[in-house]
Each structure stands twice: as structure tokens, then as C-alpha cells.
């Protein structure tokens, strides 16, 4: 029975001591480090001098030095508990021949080795990868002597509280407050001894960092103070110590004495027992004098020189950016040539957000001319080969001299390196095609459509017969018909246009244009004439009246449906009005719609000799002439047989000369 009572008393005593151990006071004090203590581990370039100085760094460049108390310190009663109060104080000194060197830090870390700590500005604590990582679980007080912009440092002589990062949660220039609340600066790199106190109050989470010159009592007012719960930062068991680093300029950092305590204030250091620092020749050295006297002077001279170099490079780069190549033959087009610089600023650097659309030739951008505030559309035409560029520019400029109310005005051109930029007036209502297909949000009534048709017909008649030369557009289609503010139809995009004298035809044998608008004779011979424009205009008439694309895919059979053949079948069945656009509703002129559908078939006849001229087309549209009987139409319809012509691609555009959809010059694309 006696042994049972004795065992019970022993067990309860042991259990009480174990409960109490977590809140016991843990402390240690080093008034110097001689003889070298066995419970201090030193790593890297850190050493302990014969007279008992803990020397964290030496003259080795780009290295780290660590010194840690070897035993883990219990900061929390449980892994998820709150952090106990702790405090520490130490005396340090930093010596360097010039006032530029890296500093040091008091550290609480889960590992005394800090294996991933980098030198230089990282002070041996972190590196470029893990700086700021919450999994670091590192608390530190840095005494930093270099201003690093990347860490938002206060200056090049500051004290900061760091949590998992060298971006201090709070910092202050190094110094102390006297009894009269007057602040006094302290220079960290001064070869002088200074004392630092770090205190954390567990219940209030208050962190205070205080410093003072060696031998002074601890100031009443802390230098840096912040409330921060460290429960998520510190683990249950942690290691305490110091970390430092060197860069390309070295320094010597010493810790003369160190005291630390948990659940109690750190014991005061016996300042009289601390080891002495080495005796340095504090007279200005040659290196220091050079740094002090010549570096500022060189900087004053070098900064303007570097600014001049920067400005020269900036100007040269800017000139290259806006450089234009002007050849002798372009002098005659001087008034039509625009500066690339103006177009660059007009389109805000040809940014993607200003793209109105893209096509076979390139992209089209909306812009506002800087001086006149005129809205423009700029088409960037890629020109891989210089062959024929002179002739192309000459034709474009000549076309730009045309003036007709139903043509999109060409403002001018710009040639730069391997690309050509064509500048047109901007049409606010976009291209015609966006009002026709796929149940558009906004549709045109029949009066508006008939007005557009008449406008385009008038423009083509002007091109074919009224101007000083014959202009074959070669790319008449709905997307190249632009609508101005009054919804007048304007024919644009003369990128494929060709000029010839009246009474003659162009000699080209190159098939260009957009699939679905190409006349069979043009595909067969490669020759473009005014009748090929009439064919494309006939397809356009059917598009406007039917609200369908020139070529569509049947959703059920997957076959291609040619609009001209589709309308022709309705005509053969004597119900051609059934081909009209359902979006027209019931408010339309039946005779006009029927006339436009039949005129579209006539214009898109497979035989070019059976097609009317644009003069005749205008007469039919204006009611000045009666539309001829369509009964002689060849039952083969349009003559376009999809899949029988080589050279087309899946997108329906001829690879030999695809056009840029001019609707891209509008806001609707």
C-alpha cells in the first residue's frame, strides 16, 4: 500500500511538471562567446574569434553566415496554440571600409541551417523563389544597410520587422528616442557598438523593436512597434539565431553578446564583460576617400552623359520606328502620301482593339487623325514583293482622284518597308453585309435597300464610263459596300481595281476576286472586263433582295447552294418572289423586288454578251427602260459549277488573289 501511494505521488508530480514545463521560463545569456559554446552552431563564413566575438561575415564576397542556438525553443504549448511571450537583446557592430555593405538579422526559423538563403540583399534568409512564401515560417528583425527597391526599403540605414519576406511589415530609419522624445539617428555601418531589444507580448501580440548606442539604457519608446499575431508564423518548436550575408562589397559583422528568454524578459547583458572589437584604423582609407570624394563627382558627370545617351538612343529608335522609304518615282504622288507617324498615332499604334476586321490582304484599323480629328480607316496591305509596286501605287492614287458620291473616298496612302497602307474615309454604319445575313439585329427596309442598290449601280457606271479611264473594280460584293451616315451605299476597296483606256481591256490573265462573285468567263480566261463587274453586281442584287450569301451550305445535305442557281430555280417555277428576304415583311414594292431579282439573274448570266452594261442597269433601276424578257436565259443558270474550278480553297476565296473585305473599314466588323 505504501508503494502504491508513493507511485501515485510520483506520477502526479511528474504529470504536473509536464503540464508546467510548457510555460516554464527558458532563457540563455552569452556575455561574449569564449570559450566557444557547444550550444551555438555556426555555418557558412561565420566564426568565433579567439577573444569571444561572434563574427558573422568576413572578407569573402557573396557568402552567407549563420549562427543559431542549437536547441529548439518551444514557443507554443500546442501546434495550434498561441505564441508565448519572448524577448531578446544583443550587442552588434558593423565595420566596412566604405559605407556600402549588407546587414544582418535576428531570426526565428524552423531550421537553423536556412539552406535556401542567398547572399547579397537576401541576407542569407530567403532567395528570389521563396521570398514571401507563407510556408517559410520565419520571423526576423533586419538591420539593413542597403536600400532595395524590390523590397520597398525605407532607406539604406533602417530596421525592419520581417515575416516570411524581406518586404518588412514595418520599418524605420535606424535610431532611438531619448527621454524628451527627441529622435537621434544611428548609422549601422559605423564600426561602433549598438544594442538592440526585441520584445513580443503573447497576450496582446505587440512586437517592439528598440535600439540605442552601446552603454545607454533601453529607451522607453520603441523604434518600431506593431501588433501582429504570430500563431500562424511560428511553429511549436523553433530555432533562434542570426543571419548575415556579403555581396561584391564586403563587411565585418560582429555580435558581442546575446540574451534570449521565453515567458520572461531576457536577462540584461553584462556590458563590461563583453569582448572588445578589433582595433581598426578609422582614418579614411584610399578606397574610402575615393568613394567619398570622387564617386559623387563622377556620378554628377556620368548621369548627364547617360541621359544624353538614353535620349540619343530613344530618338534614333523613334526615327527607325517611323522611318519611311521614299523613292524618286513617288514625288509625283507627294500630296497623296501620308506620314506613317500620323497613321501610327491615329490608330494608337495599330493596337488590336482598333482592328475593324481582317481579310486576305491584311488588317483594317479605325483611326482618328491627330491634327484634323478626321475619322479614317487604315488598311495595311502586305507587299512581299516590290514588283509592280510603282504601278499599283500609281493606280491607287489615280483612283483616289475620282470624286463620286457613291464611292468611298481614298484619303491617301503610305508606303513603309514591305507594306502599303491605304487610308479611306471611315463609314460609321459599316458594311452592307452585316444588315443582310443570319437574322441581323438591324435590318434595312426595301426603300433603304433599293437606295443602296441604285447608289452602287451609279458608282459602277461612273467607273466604267464616266471617268477619264475605265476602272474595273474586280471585287464588287456586299462587304465592300459601305453605308455612310445617311445610309447611302458607297463602293469601296479598290485594292484589286485595274485601269485601262476606254475602248481597250486590261491585259491581265490573273484570276482575282472573291469566290461566289466570279464570273465563269473570268475564271475560264483570267481576263477581267466591265462585264465581270456586272456579273458580281448581279450577285449583289440577289444578296440584297434575298438576304442570303452568294454561296451557302445546306444544313441537311451539306451541299453548297449557289444563290444565282437558287433564285433561277424559283424563276423557272414562276414564283420568283418566293426568293425574297423574309425580313422584308409585307412593306415592300412587289414590282421593284421582282424587277431586282430578274435583273440580278440577267446580270449574272453565264454569257458575258447577254449581260447588260451598267448604263442599261441604271435605266432599268430608274424605270427609264423595260427589263427584257428573261425567257432566252440558258437553263444552265449562272454557269458557276462549284467544285469544277481549280484554285479555290475551302474558305471560298481564290488563293491567287483574295480580297480584303472592305466591310472591315467600318465599325460593324
Swiss-Prot record:
Keyword annotations of the record: ATP-binding, Cell membrane, Glycoprotein, Kinase, Lectin, Membrane, Nucleotide-binding, Plant defense, Receptor, Serine/threonine-protein kinase, Signal, Transferase, Transmembrane, Transmembrane helix
Known glycosylation sites: 58, 80, 127, 152, 185
Keyword Thylakoid recorded: no
SMART domains reported for this sequence: S_TKc
Main localization of the protein described in the UniProt heading: membrane
Gene3D superfamilies: 2.60.120.200, Phosphorylase Kinase, domain 1 (3.30.200.20), Transferase(Phosphotransferase) domain 1 (1.10.510.10)
GO biological process: defense response to bacterium; defense response to oomycetes
Residues of the Protein kinase domain: 350-627
Active site: 475
Residues binding ATP: 356-364, 379
Pfam families: Lectin_legB, Pkinase
A GO term, aspect molecular function: ATP binding
Extracellular topological segments: 24-294
Consequence of gene disruption: Increased susceptibility to the oomycetes Phytophthora brassicae and Phytophthora capsici and to the bacteria Pseudomonas syringae, characterized by stronger necrotic symptoms and higher bacterial proliferation.
Membrane topology annotation: Single-pass type I membrane protein
E.C. code: 2.7.11.1
Regions crossing the membrane: 295-315
PROSITE patterns assigned to the protein according to its UniProt record, in alphabetical order: PROTEIN_KINASE_ATP (PS00107), PROTEIN_KINASE_DOM (PS50011), PROTEIN_KINASE_ST (PS00108)
Domain of life from the UniProt record: Eukaryota
Enzyme type, top EC level: transferase
Record's function text: Involved in resistance response to the pathogenic oomycetes Phytophthora infestans and Phytophthora capsici and to the pathogenic bacteria Pseudomonas syringae.
Family according to the record: In the C-terminal section; belongs to the protein kinase superfamily. Ser/Thr protein kinase family.
Protein name: L-type lectin-domain containing receptor kinase IV.4
Annotated gene: LECRK44
Amino acid at each position: 500500500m505504501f508503494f502504491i501511494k508513493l507511485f501515485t505521488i510520483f506520477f502526479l508530480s511528474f504529470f504536473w511538471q509536464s503540464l508546467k514545463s510548457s510555460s516554464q521560463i527558458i532563457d540563455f545569456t552569452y556575455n561574449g562567446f569564449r570559450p566557444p559554446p557547444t550550444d551555438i552552431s555556426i555555418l557558412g563564413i561565420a566564426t568565433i574569434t579567439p577573444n569571444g566575438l561572434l563574427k558573422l561575415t568576413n572578407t569573402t564576397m557573396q557568402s552567407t553566415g549563420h549562427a543559431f542556438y542549437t536547441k529548439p525553443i518551444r514557443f507554443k504549448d500546442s501546434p495550434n496554440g498561441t505564441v508565448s511571450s519572448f524577448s531578446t537583446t544583443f550587442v552588434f557592430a558593423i565595420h566596412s571600409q566604405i559605407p556600402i555593405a549588407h546587414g544582418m538579422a535576428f531570426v526565428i526559423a524552423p531550421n537553423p541551417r536556412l539552406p535556401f538563403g542567398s547572399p547579397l540583399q537576401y541576407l542569407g534568409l530567403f532567395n528570389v523563389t521563396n521570398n514571401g512564401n507563407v510556408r517559410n515560417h520565419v520571423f526576423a528583425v533586419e538591420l539593413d544597410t542597403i536600400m532595395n527597391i524590390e523590397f520597398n526599403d525605407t532607406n539604406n540605414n533602417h530596421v525592419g520587422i520581417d515575416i516570411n519576406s524581406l518586404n518588412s511589415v514595418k520599418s524605420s530609419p535606424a535610431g532611438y528616442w531619448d527621454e524628451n522624445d527627441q529622435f537621434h539617428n544611428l548609422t549601422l555601418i559605423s564600426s561602433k557598438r549598438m544594442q538592440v531589444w526585441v520584445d513580443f507580448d503573447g497576450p496582446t501580440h505587440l512586437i517592439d523593436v528598440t535600439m540605442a548606442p552601446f552603454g545607454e539604457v533601453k529607451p522607453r519608446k520603441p523604434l518600431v512597434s506593431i501588433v501582429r499575431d504570430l500563431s500562424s508564423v511560428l511553429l511549436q518548436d523553433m530555432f533562434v539565431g542570426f543571419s548575415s550575408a556579403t555581396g561584391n562589397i564586403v563587411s565585418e559583422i560582429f555580435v558581442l553578446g546575446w540574451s534570449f528568454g521565453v515567458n520572461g524578459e531576457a536577462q540584461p547583458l553584462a556590458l563590461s564583460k563583453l569582448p572588445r572589437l578589433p582595433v581598426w584604423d578609422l582614418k579614411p582609407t584610399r578606397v574610402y576617400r575615393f568613394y567619398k570624394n570622387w564617386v559623387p563627382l563622377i556620378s554628377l558627370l556620368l548621369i548627364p552623359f547617360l541621359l544624353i545617351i538614353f535620349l540619343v538612343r530613344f530618338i534614333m529608335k523613334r526615327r527607325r520606328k517611323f522611318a519611311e522609304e521614299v523613292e524618286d518615282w513617288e514625288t509625283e504622288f507627294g500630296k497623296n502620301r501620308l506620314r506613317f507617324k500620323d497613321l501610327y498615332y491615329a490608330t494608337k499604334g495599330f493596337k488590336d482593339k482598333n482592328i475593324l476586321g481582317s481579310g486576305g490582304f491584311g488588317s483594317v484599323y479605325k483611326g482618328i487623325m491627330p491634327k484634323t480629328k478626321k475619322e479614317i480607316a487604315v488598311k495595311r496591305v502586305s507587299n512581299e514583293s516590290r514588283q509592280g509596286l510603282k504601278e499599283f501605287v500609281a493606280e491607287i492614287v489615280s483612283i483616289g482622284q475620282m470624286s463620286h458620291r457613291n464611292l468611298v473616298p481614298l484619303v491617301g496612302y503610305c508606303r513603309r518597308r514591305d507594306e502599303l497602307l491605304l487610308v479611306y474615309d471611315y463609314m460609321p454604319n459599316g458594311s452592307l453585309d452585316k444588315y443582310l445575313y443570319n437574322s441581323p439585329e438591324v435590318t434595312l427596309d426595301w426603300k433603304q435597300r433599293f437606295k443602296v442598290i441604285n447608289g452602287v449601280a451609279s458608282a459602277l457606271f461612273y467607273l466604267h464610263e464616266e471617268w477619264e479611264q475605265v476602272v474595273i473594280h474586280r471585287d464588287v460584293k456586299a462587304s465592300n459596300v459601305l453605308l455612310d451616315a445617311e445610309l447611302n451605299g458607297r463602293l469601296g476597296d479598290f485594292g484589286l481595281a485595274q485601269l485601262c483606256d476606254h475602248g481597250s481591256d486590261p491585259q491581265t490573265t490573273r484570276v482575282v476576286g472573291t469566290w461566289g462573285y466570279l464570273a465563269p468567263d473570268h475564271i475560264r480566261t483570267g481576263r477581267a472586263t466591265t462585264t465581270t463587274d456586272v456579273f458580281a453586281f448581279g450577285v449583289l442584287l440577289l444578296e440584297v433582295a434575298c438576304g442570303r450569301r452568294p454561296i451557302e451550305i445546306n444544313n441537311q445535305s451539306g451541299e453548297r447552294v449557289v444563290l444565282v442557281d437558287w433564285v433561277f430555280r424559283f424563276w423557272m417555277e414562276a414564283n420568283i418572289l418566293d426568293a425574297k428576304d423574309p425580313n422584308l415583311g409585307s412593306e415592300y414594292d412587289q414590282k421593284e423586288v421582282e424587277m431586282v431579282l430578274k435583273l440580278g439573274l440577267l446580270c449574272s448570266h453565264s454569257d458575258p454578251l447577254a449581260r447588260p452594261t451598267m448604263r442599261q442597269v441604271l435605266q432599268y433601276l430608274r424605270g427609264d427602260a423595260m427589263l427584257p424578257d428573261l425567257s432566252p436565259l440558258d437553263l444552265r443558270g449562272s454557269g458557276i459549277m462549284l467544285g469544277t474550278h481549280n484554285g479555290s480553297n475551302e474558305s471560298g476565296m481564290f488563293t491567287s488573289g483574295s480580297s480584303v473585305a472592305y466591310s472591315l473599314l467600318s465599325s460593324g466588323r
